[in-house]
Amino acid sequence: MSYEGSDDWRRVLNDGIREYSAGARSSDAFGRVLCNAREHHFVIDGPVWNGCPGEALTPGEAFLASVAACGVELAQVIGREDGIDVGPVAVRIHAAVNREDPVREDLTVFNRVEMRFEIGGVDEDQARRLVERMGRRCPLYGSVAASAAELEVKVEAHSTRGTG
């Protein structure tokens, strides 16, 4: 559903509320989940260590890819808002859960998360500011940062513009 050109689009822009919806249901194959968001449909598999297929993205991989995608997209958006000509952006994220040493007893959260941002067309200071602002704006990153026992974020700037 596109809000552009409708009153709903203006409401989203004016009241500051951002809403997201997605769904999932089991399939005929154990551990294979049929997912949807808006009109997009995709498969997520449970991991092999749970006896699931593990062929498609796992829930953890899909979540981490979403965190990384939010970082890339918002670095570009914030750069545009600030009049910075941001070049190619890449984000790598790695996370670990240690079931033998849980962070919390009531919920499973990541013990350690490492993120690496590479941002082209900017200097080191601009890159760090973009990542800092992204962190305040992305609810996925915020969820990870607020819950992980350890969070390491590395930022690398490339003042030359690449082809992305």
Regions found by a protein language model. Name each.
Residues 1-65, 76-164:
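Extended beta-strand/beta-hairpin segments
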